Amino acid sequence: MEIAAEMSPLGDRPVSRRRLWIGLVVSIALCLGAGGLGAALTTPEINGWYRTIAKPAWNPPDWIFGPVWSTLYVMMAIAAWLVWKPAGLRAAAAPLALFGVQLVLNMAWSWIFFLLHRPGWAFVEIVLLWGAIVATMVAFLKRSKVAGMLLVPYLAWVSFASVLNFTIWRLNA
């Protein structure tokens, strides 16, 4: 068995490279799966309800959202993995719990905005999401500077999405 330089959460045994790679794959699958659940509700509404509502002139083209979100989900997954990797799940429980909260809020936004057609409610929810991302970034930065910095593009995109959400809400109120 090939041994990595990483130690177990208790520091008593080395962790195999295989386990580290499996952790990364699981992290990526979890994040992309969460994104897929949100997209499953979003996609049918892009050509339906979303086409019929007023949007600002600076609204990005629909095709840009898939690649941007896919990239962000992979970056989020790597960040979570970097927090989990050196210490394990028990030792990183608090920052990973925050990560889980923001991931659930991320999915919930799609449901509220696209499935329920409630831009006002979605705006309140995305503000909560923004706060959860900031809290996750702070917790991640304490464990890994790289992990925290990997969430910066996500925070920037959600900041933009918040302004877009607010504008759509006001245009259609």
What are these regions (language model features)?
Residues 1-19:
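Short, Lys/Arg-rich, polar N-terminal cytosolic tail immediately upstream
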Residues 111-121, 169-173:
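Membrane-interface helix caps and helix-loop-helix hairpins in membrane proteins
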Residues 59-75, 116-129:
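Membrane-interface loop-to-helix entry segments
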Residues 139-173:
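Terminal transmembrane helical module of multi-pass membrane proteins
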Residues 74-110:
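Helix-adjacent hinge/juxtasegments
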